[in-house]
Amino acid sequence: MNKEQRLKELTDMQYYVTQENGTEPPFRNEFDEHFEEGIYVDIVSGKPLFSSLDKYNSGCGWPAFTKPIQKEEVTEHFDTSHGMRRVEVRSKEADSHLGHVFPDGPSELGGLRYCINSASLRFVAKEDLEKEGYGQFLSLFK
């Protein structure tokens, strides 16, 4: 399925967040309080982005991660929208808006907080990794 077809399958919120650089409501989203073992992939491209092993409760109202699974799968861009100075995070392949990265994460884990919109992600549970084509990430959970 090509990107155009995948975009047609997104919900209104998923499209707003990933394609229009939107932000979903804090604390009222799918993955803020979700801590099952597995990985989070780009809702548009399916590329692996984050692991539950790097997720933590930052209290910000959105899923927070200390790092991406593979740094090369995300891009960072200086963002001055809404009168703020911050760093936007996008998926490399689909160019989906994911959220922002801030330098206030746990210092013992690198000091970064990837604050990511749930609407930009799809969760793949550890037990489904092999069947969904992400078997190479099973080793993360051993």
UniProtKB/Swiss-Prot annotation:
Q: Where are the transmembrane segments?
A: none
One GO molecular-function entry: peptide-methionine (R)-S-oxide reductase activity
According to its record, what are the GO cellular component terms? Answer: cytoplasm
Q: What class of enzyme is it?
A: oxidoreductase
What Gene3D superfamilies does the database record attribute to this sequence? Peptide methionine sulfoxide reductase (2.170.150.20)
List each copy of the MsrB domain by range: 3-126
Instruction: List the InterPro entries hit by this protein, alphabetically.
Output: Met_Sox_Rdtase_MsrB (IPR028427), Met_Sox_Rdtase_MsrB_dom (IPR002579), Mss4-like_sf (IPR011057)
Catalytic residues, per the record, are: C115 (nucleophile)
The protein's Enzyme Commission number:
1.8.4.12
Q: Name one GO biological process term.
A: response to oxidative stress
Swiss-Prot/TrEMBL keywords: Oxidoreductase
The record, for Pfam families, names: SelR
The catalysed reaction is: L-methionyl-[protein] + [thioredoxin]-disulfide + H2O = L-methionyl-(R)-S-oxide-[protein] + [thioredoxin]-dithiol
Q: Does the keyword Oxidoreductase apply?
A: yes
The UniProt family comment states: Belongs to the MsrB Met sulfoxide reductase family.
Give the HAMAP family listed for this entry.
MsrB
**Protein name per its UniProtKB record:** Peptide methionine sulfoxide reductase MsrB
Species whose genome carries this gene: Lysinibacillus sphaericus (strain C3-41)
